[in-house]
Amino acid sequence: MQEWFQNLFAATLGLGDLGITVGLVVSVIVKIVIILIPLILTVAYLTYFERKVIGFMQLRVGPNVTGPWGLIQPFADVFKLLFKEVTRPRLSNKALFYIGPIMSLAPSFAAWAVIPFNEEWVLTNINIGLLYILMITSLSVYGVIIAGWASNSKYSFLGAMRASAQSISYEIAMSAALVCVVMVSGSMNFSDIVAAQAKGIAGGSVFSWNWLPLFPIFIVYLISAVAETNRAPFDVAEGESEIVAGHHVEYSGFAFALFFLAEYIFMILISALTSLMFLGGWLSPFPQSWGFIGTPSAFWMFVKMAAVLYWYLWIRATFPRYRYDQIMRLGWKVLIPIGFAYIVVLGVWMISPLNLWK
C-alpha cells in the first residue's frame, strides 16, 4: 500500500521527492482509518453482545426492541450519547474536565499501532512492540486521575484514586507474566513471539503455545488483565453501591462516551495481547494438512480474541464484586509474589536439561 501511494504522488502526479513523503503520510493515515473504524464498530457490537450474553446467563432476553433482535441497539445508544448535553459541575476545572476523557481514550487507540493480526497486517512492526504497549497503556491512568480531580467531587476523586491504585498494582503482576513470555521467546517483537510458539517440543501444535508451559503465569495474567481494565468483579472504581460511578459520575453525553469507548477498546486490546502472547496469535490449532482451517491467518487471531472477550463477559455475569481491600490484597500478596517467583523458576527451568524452548 505504501509503495502504491508513493508511486501515485511521485510519478503519476509528478511531485517527485515530495510525493514520496506525501505518499508515506497518506498510506499511514489510510492504515490508521482501516484499523480505527472496525475497532469502533467492534466496540459498539461488543456492548450488544455483552448485554445478550449476560441476559442469557441471568435468564433474560437482553436488547430485543430496536431493530430485528435488537441489532440496531448499539447505534441507538451512540445517538443518545451524542445528542445528550455535556454538563459540567460549576466548581470543576473546565480545561482538565475535558482533557481527562481524551487522555483516557488516546492511549487505547495509539496502542493498536504495533498489534499484528498476521505476519503482514500490522501498522508498525517494531522490535520493542511489547514494551511500547506497556508504556502507552500506563498513560491512561493520568486521564483517570485528572478526570477525578477536575470534577471537584468526592465520589469522583475517590473512584479515580481507587482506579489508579488498582491499575498500577496489577500492572506489576501483568508485567511479570509478560516477562516470562519474553524469556521463552527471546524477543519483544510480537511477530517473533508468535513464530516462537510455532516451534517447541510439541511441533507447533496448540500444546506448544505459551499457555500450557506457562499455565500458572497465564492464570496470573488473565486475572491481572481483568483488574487492569477495572472490569467486574474488580470494578470497585465504579462501585454503584458505594461511589455511584467513580470518576465517571460527573460526566454525561459525549464526554462519558469517550470513557466508555476507552474501557471497551482496552478490553479488545487485552484480548489481542492475550492471543499473541499465550494463544499462538494467528496460528491455527489444527495441522496445516487440514487445508484452510489449518492455515495460519488473521481469522484465527479474531477467533481467539472473541474467546477472550467472551471470558470477560462470563466472569462479569458469574462472580460477585470484591471489596477494595480484597482486590489490593490479592494483587500484592498473591499475584505479584507468584509472578516474580515464576520468573526465577522459569530461569532455572531454561538452564536445566529439561528446557522446552531450545
UniProtKB/Swiss-Prot annotation:
Recall the GO molecular function terms of this protein's record.
NADH dehydrogenase activity; oxidoreductase activity, acting on NAD(P)H, quinone or similar compound as acceptor; quinone binding
Q: Which residues cross the membrane?
A: 20-40, 95-115, 128-148, 168-188, 206-226, 253-273, 290-310, 334-354
Compartments where located: Cell inner membrane
In what way does this protein cross or attach to the membrane? Multi-pass membrane protein
Entry EC no(s): 7.1.1.-
One GO BP: aerobic respiration
Mind telling me which GO cellular component terms the entry cites?
Answer: plasma membrane
Q: Which family does it belong to?
A: Belongs to the complex I subunit 1 family.
Function comment: NDH-1 shuttles electrons from NADH, via FMN and iron-sulfur (Fe-S) centers, to quinones in the respiratory chain. The immediate electron acceptor for the enzyme in this species is believed to be ubiquinone. Couples the redox reaction to proton translocation (for every two electrons transferred, four hydrogen ions are translocated across the cytoplasmic membrane), and thus conserves the redox energy in a proton gradient. This subunit may bind ubiquinone.
Name assigned to this protein:
NADH-quinone oxidoreductase subunit H
Q: Which gene encodes it?
A: nuoH
